[in-house]
Regions:
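Conserved AAA+ ATPase small/helical "lid" subdomain
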Residues: 149-179
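P-loop NTPase catalytic phosphate-binding loop
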Residues: 1-43, 53-142, 146-150, 160, ...
Length: 179
């Protein structure tokens, strides 16, 4: 779904085995950052930057349709084991990554417990919802009316848990290629 211009700015993975390699690398990076933070007695990335003088970059992992990724329906034993490893790495990063500057953006159409495991869902500190029916709105932000009030023609408009409505940017290939 992504043209060549996005590959300059993001590492796009479509194979589960390659994804696990990346997630293992992120888990290793998390452990390395823990060691570095401990050396300077920093509780989070902001303190680490202040105390060490090192402007450590944040890392953002984004997954569009995480439900599709984690769906075990019809999977054989080997694939289920692979997906369990992926899920475990995502859960680790969701639990510990934020303080160490490693962040997850996980998108799904239906963020219920059957699709997004509690270990991951409960550790995502911000939930955003686009236009949705009452049930989905309630699942995400607890207000059965909020997300359904976004106009049908408001493409890219979202609402946060606290009721803040915002308009997302739209980046087309031409815009990206000019950077």
């Amino acid at each position: 779904d992504f043209s060549y211009v996005w590959q300059e700015f993001a590492y796009i993975i479509t194979e589960e085995t390659k994804l696990l390699v990346l997630l293992n690398h992120l888990a290793d990076t998390l452990e390395e950052r823990k060691r570095l933070f401990k050396k300077v007695d920093a509780a989070n990335i902001i303190e680490y930057r202040e105390k060490s003088g090192d402007y450590m970059q944040r890392i953002v992992f984004a997954c569009d349709e995480v439900a599709e990724l984690l769906d075990k329906t019809g999977a054989d034993k080997a694939r289920k084991e692979l997906l369990a490893q992926i899920e475990a790495r995502l859960a680790l990063i969701a639990r510990q990554g934020r303080a160490f500057g490693i962040h997850l953006i996980l998108a799904t159409q239906r963020p219920d417990a059957n699709i997004l495991p509690g270990q991951i869902k409960n550790n995502m500190n911000i939930r955003i919802c686009g236009r949705a029916d009452t049930t989905l709105s309630t699942i995400i932000i607890g207000d059965g009316r909020a997300a359904e009030q976004i106009p049908h023609d408001a493409q890219g408009r979202f609402i946060m848990e606290d009721g803040t409505v915002f308009q997302a940017y739209y980046f087309n290939d031409d815009t990206i290629s000019k950077w």
